Design a protein with these regions (language model features):
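Single-stranded RNA-binding regions, centering on S1/OB-family and related RNA-binding modules
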Residues: 1-285
Length: 285
């Protein structure tokens, strides 16, 4: 018998909540979502594993994460000396994703309750390890879907499955790849984290670009919003005011100081909402 095999077990005895089975003439514990459905002397297919007590068990609910397939695993424990332990659905066994397969900086590691997509790997000591999915694994594993039609500024959610040099890669709940550049996040994002962001573009290879920042209009302050509204409601979408305007002209128009005006205009320029040309402030087309 080997860890992670999917094989046939014969139920030998059912007593209270304990089910004993037989695999290759060796006793094993049999796990099931509903043991009342198990019958003595009947054969069942299941997933063979050594539990945390070193006992052989067969779970008749075969986990999606196996030696041949990828599935979701929920982080149960973080151990900075070894890695993170994830649950793949087994009642008394978590799977270790080694620190060798995790980011160098532990601040980028998954945290408890985060989710990872893993496949199992068995080493020469018959131990099971969790291996993280790549783009190719997600495609071949059937995680990708093109059913949903996304729109600009739509809010989407997903889990981080890979950290890149300039940003993070996400698998959306709708089954599409997404990318989050580091300039589009306000704080560190880590592996396995569930995030919700706004679509800001559509990149190559059907990958969606998202942002965790509020859109430009939501990020401007009251002075900037007042100036932007004034420009928008002029007939030709331009306002005869600029850095060269006098404090009195600015005060008469907006009731704010010139320094406040310059700060607000600078914010609007930085957000690419307006332009400043020939003494006019204009809505950027």
């Amino acid at each position: 018998m080997k860890n992670g095999e999917i094989l046939e077990v014969t139920v030998k005895e059912i007593k209270d909540n304990t089910v004993i089975g037989l695999v290759d003439e060796q006793n094993v514990y049999v796990r099931a979502k509903d043991i009342s459905l198990l019958e003595p002397e009947k054969k069942y297919f299941g997933f063979l594993y050594l539990n945390r007590h070193g006992e052989w068990c067969v779970d008749t609910t075969i986990p999606k994460a196996s030696l041949k397939s990828f599935g979701w695993g929920k982080v149960e424990t973080v151990d900075h000396s070894s890695g993170v332990f994830v649950s793949i659905g087994l009642a008394d066994k978590d799977i270790l994703v080694s620190l060798d397969d995790l980011p160098d900086n532990s601040r980028d590691w998954p945290q408890v309750d985060d989710e990872l997509i893993v496949r199992l790997e068995r080493d020469n000591k018959d131990r099971l390890w969790g291996k993280l999915a790549t783009d190719e694994d997600l495609i071949s594993g059937g995680f990708i879907s093109f059913d949903h039609k996304f729109k600009q500024n739509e809010m989407v959610s997903g889990h981080v499955y890979h950290l890149g040099k300039t940003g993070v890669f996400i698998l959306l709940k709708e089954g599409r790849f997404a990318y989050l550049h580091h300039t589009e996040m306000e704080e560190n994002v880590h592996l396995g984290q569930e995030i919700t962001g706004r679509i800001i573009g559509f990149g190559a290879h059907d990958r969606i670009n998202i942002s965790l920042l509020k859109n430009a209009y939501a990020r401007i302050d009251d002075d900037a919003a007042m100036i932007l509204a004034a420009i928008k409601f002029t007939p030709d979408k331009k306002l005869l005011l600029s850095d060269s305007s006098t404090p009195k002209e600015i005060k008469d128009k907006f009731g704010i100081s010139k320094s406040s005006f310059k700060r607000a205009v600078g914010h609007l320029l930085k957000q690419n909402l307006i332009t400043s040309e020939n003494g006019y402030l204009k809505i950027k087309s």
